[in-house]
């Protein structure tokens, strides 16, 4: 998978949510991850949410879209409710 992100957006995401995009992309390698469509944010383009764990053990939600064979993403830690669903 080829990932891309805006450097400034990456800084903002890390400052706001404490998740770097380098860590966020690790979720795509989690064998237990699950992906759903994000209808609330799929107005101009389809966005998906992947729920998974990074190599450091943090459980993350990564929102992503594919543009020209590259993935653009945003990430945050799972809420307690999301974490419970992921663990089941």
Features from the language model and the residues they span:
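Ribonuclease/tRNase effector modules and their secretory precursors
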Residues: 1-88
């Amino acid at each position: 998978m080829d990932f891309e992100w805006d450097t400034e957006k990456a800084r903002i995401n890390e400052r706001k949510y404490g998740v770097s995009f380098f860590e966020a992309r690790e979720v795509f390698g989690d064998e237990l991850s699950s992906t759903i469509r994000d209808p609330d944010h799929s107005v101009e383009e389809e966005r998906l949410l992947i729920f998974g764990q990074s190599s450091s053990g943090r459980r993350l939600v990564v929102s992503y879209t594919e543009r020209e064979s590259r993935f653009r993403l945003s990430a945050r830690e799972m809420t307690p409710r999301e974490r419970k669903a992921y663990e089941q």
